[in-house]
Structure formats: C-alpha cells, structure tokens
C-alpha cells in the first residue's frame, strides 16, 4: 500500500469501513432478495430487456384503480362509529379499527401526482370512495380521473362498508374498466418513470411481484393480521382447484397488475366464499385477500402472469426509521438511482414519531416537486 493510499485511509476511514461493511453485510431496502448496491443496475437491465418486445403487438389500454377514504369527513366519522358500536371486538382482526388505518395525510394527492407524472400512458384513473371527493380534485382539469362510489359496485345490503377486502372483491365491476388494470392503495407511490411493460408484457402477460417472505415465518413472528389470514384462506381455495400447488409467499407491498376476466373467474369459482364475508363492516380474520393475493396467483396458475422484479421501499410513516428512508430516497433521486416505487404504510398508531406527518409532507413535496404556498 503506497503512502497516498495510507493517508487517504486515515483521512477517510469512515468511508472505508462503510464500504467494507456494505460489501460484507449488504443493506436491503426491498422485499425481494436484491441488495441496495444492485438496485439501479437491475432496474436498467430489466428496462433494456423489456424494450426489445414493447412494440411487437399493438398497445392495449391500461387503467389505474385507487381505493380511498377521507377520515376527516364528519359524515363518514358518524357513520363509522355508529356502525362499529354493535360489533363484537373479538371478531375484529388485528389493527382493523386502529385509527392509523383510516388516517388521511393527503397520500392520494401525491400518489395520483406520481402516476400522472411517471405513467402518462395510463388511460383512466379510477378512485373508489364512500361517496367522497378529494378537496384537490377538479375534474375539469383532471379529465383522466373518475370517481366511483361504493354503491356503484357493492350491493346496498352490504353498505356502508369500512372493509378493504369487501371493496377490493368488487373492483372488477367498475364501469368502463379496462381488461388490464393496476390496483393501488393510496400509500403506494411510483418513484420513477415506468413503462407499461413493467406491469404487463406486450402480449398481455401480467407482472407478479413476489416477496421474499413466507406465511410460516410471518406467523412465527406473531403478527396475525387480517391480510395474512385472508391470504391463507385464499390459498386454501386455490388448492381446491389446483391441488398440486405449493405457494407460501405473499406479494410485495406495492401496486398490483390485474385482469378483469380473472376477477370474474374467481367469482364464478368461489362465489359462496366471497359472499360469506361481504357483510363484515371491518376486516375480520375469516375473509379472502382477493386483489393482492388470490387474483394475482390465480392469474399465474392460469398462465396470465409471470414473476417480475419490483424494487419497492417499504416502511412505516410513524417510525423513526422513516426519516432515514426519506433521506435515502431523496439522495437516490438526486443521482437518478430511484427505485420503482415506495410504500409508506400506516397501519398502527403505536410508538409514533410525534412529527411524523410533517416529515412526510416535507419529503413528498420535495420528492415530487410540489410547490407549496
């Protein structure tokens, strides 16, 4: 080792040890087995490969669907607490009534902005709501955006509902919905320009964003959420029709490419089981996770989906770790090394950073270059 290198080592020893540790113990930001150091290389490689077939067949329309609630709406609050009062708490799933599940930090505004900015090829953006309208939405300006009320999709005898599983089970009934669509929760944000073939191949094959997790390990950790049990129940139904399958894996917490005809097939196969939970006003442990488990895996088993890479940063808005992730995402944006997406989840109000909402807004305004008054 020459003298200059020795001097550099002592002058920048922190960089040396950082790089050493990163090589020895590479950091992981995502739910797939992809170390941070390889994220950008893999995103570029995938995009270059996909571009080779993007014009083989004519493009087909692709819509985006959001589900959203405004928990600050007084009428919604009154209806929610009136509906919740007679329900036996023992029947309700973990976090199902936690205020964080319905908290509104204007996520929808930022998520829609991201779709419009980074996915301009989307045909329609449907927002499914409980007869609510975002304050920022001017439909004369946002002509692609269409509001859909629960009453347009769900039988009146099941309304009102505050159960995302019930709402998701009926998404395929959206009027004028395209065969190929992408389902978003409003806590998922597109982080970079994405082409249609990130979601659907040119021949219509959907992307299946499989997570590097297992139901068994999730249960061992002890957090038995309604999403976990609803996915396990859905898996039992899939095994009834595909008895040789061995699925033990959820999907990445991000957007989900879906097909309307696969929804229709699921209803034809499992109508009784779906109808059995539609009257649950909030999430219980006896339901089906259709939009982010049953339908995507049904598509895969029928040959309509294939596993794909999805680099999505996933963290909780209320945790102290969120600020670290905000800084990392802004740094990566500055250097054009952004992930595909990020999900800033808000499922539990426990142990919250007291300034979490302010940190979130400041980050989002900066990342998406939103001018504030």
From Swiss-Prot:
InterPro entries found in the cross-reference section: Stealth, Stealth_CR1, Stealth_CR2
Class of the enzyme per the UniProt entry, highest EC level: transferase
Enzyme Commission designation: 2.7.-.-
Record keyword Methyltransferase present: no
Record GO biological process: polysaccharide biosynthetic process
Disulfide bonds: none
Alphabetically ordered keywords of this record: Exopolysaccharide synthesis, Transferase
GO molecular-function terms, A-Z: transferase activity, transferring phosphorus-containing groups
Domain of life: Bacteria
One Pfam assignment: Stealth_CR1
Note: Stealth proteins are part of a protein family that is conserved from bacteria to higher eukaryotes. Family members were first identified in microbes as proteins that help pathogens to elude the host innate immune system. Microbial stealth proteins are involved in the biosynthesis of exopolysaccharides. Stealth proteins are predicted to function as hexose-1-phosphoryltransferases.
Family (UniProt): Belongs to the stealth family.
Described function: Part of a capsule gene locus. Expression was not detected under standard growth conditions.
Full protein name: Capsular polysaccharide phosphotransferase
